[in-house]
Amino acid sequence: MNLNSIPAFDDNYIWVLNDEAGRCLIVDPGDAEPVLNAIAANNWQPEAIFLTHHHHDHVGGVKELVEKFPQIVVYGPQETQDKGTTQVVKDGETAFVLGHEFSVIATPGHTLGHICYFSKPYLFCGDTLFSGGCGRLFEGTASQMYQSLKKLSALPDDTLVCCAHEYTLSNMEFALSILPHDLSINDYYRKVKELRAKNQITQPVILKNERQINVFLRTEHIDLINVINEETLLQQPDERFAWLRSKKDRF
């Protein structure tokens, strides 16, 4: 299996997995044109589309892709049923694509119906988890997003986290504002800054490393608790997450 990223819009990534036979899986195609170009250039044969949620920058290219390749099966949560989904999937179910089983994980927060797909080592997490950050709470609650991130953080160490946006640099700038002396955060920030200066992608990321540098996955760590306690005493990790998310929204 080969993992490919296709840039779209200002900062989206459309992920494509292909096998040796050229069959491919497309994840969150917000725009059809760059996907069609990649299909033609690589002689891929699209077999399926995974949708994580209903936002237009993740589903906008579905109609055109299905018109061009009517054999495509489109998997997605209930909230994408009017966006071209032909196979609705929910938490705990599996999608069998390219000879692999992908587990469906419900991750409400960014939207209420958001889902992720996992087949070791690949995690397609849409707008739930970003490198160094997490998605905004457009529909769900902070508590829901906290629980969703806990689910993803519990996946195997070697999981390849495939995020849908290139937000890493700004996320790490925020992380530094919270934990300015953290060595892991400082090291990763320098690496990301160098990559982005060369217009290079910062993804996918390894989950084991992400747990060390993503403040939203560290709400139970004493260093972060101490920082938060300087402003307000919060007993529960989901409350600390809500505090962080609110800070990031204003950053």
Swiss-Prot record:
Pfam families: HAGH_C, Lactamase_B. Keywords: Hydrolase, Metal-binding, Zinc. Thiolesterase that catalyzes the hydrolysis of S-D-lactoyl-glutathione to form glutathione and D-lactic acid. Its cofactor is Zn(2+). Belongs to the metallo-beta-lactamase superfamily. Glyoxalase II family. It catalyses: an S-(2-hydroxyacyl)glutathione + H2O = a 2-hydroxy carboxylate + glutathione + H(+). GO terms for molecular function: hydroxyacylglutathione hydrolase activity; metal ion binding. Binds 2 Zn(2+) ions per subunit. SMART domains: Lactamase_B. Zn(2+) 2 binds at D57, H58, D127, H165. Its EC number is 3.1.2.6. It comes from Shigella dysenteriae serotype 1 (strain Sd197). Pathway: Secondary metabolite metabolism; methylglyoxal degradation; (R)-lactate from methylglyoxal: step 2/2. Monomer. The keyword Plastid does not apply. This is Hydroxyacylglutathione hydrolase. HAMAP family: Glyoxalase_2. One of its GO terms (biological process) is methylglyoxal catabolic process to D-lactate via S-lactoyl-glutathione. Zn(2+) 1 binds at H53, H55, H110, D127. It is an enzyme of class 3 (hydrolase). It comes from the Bacteria.
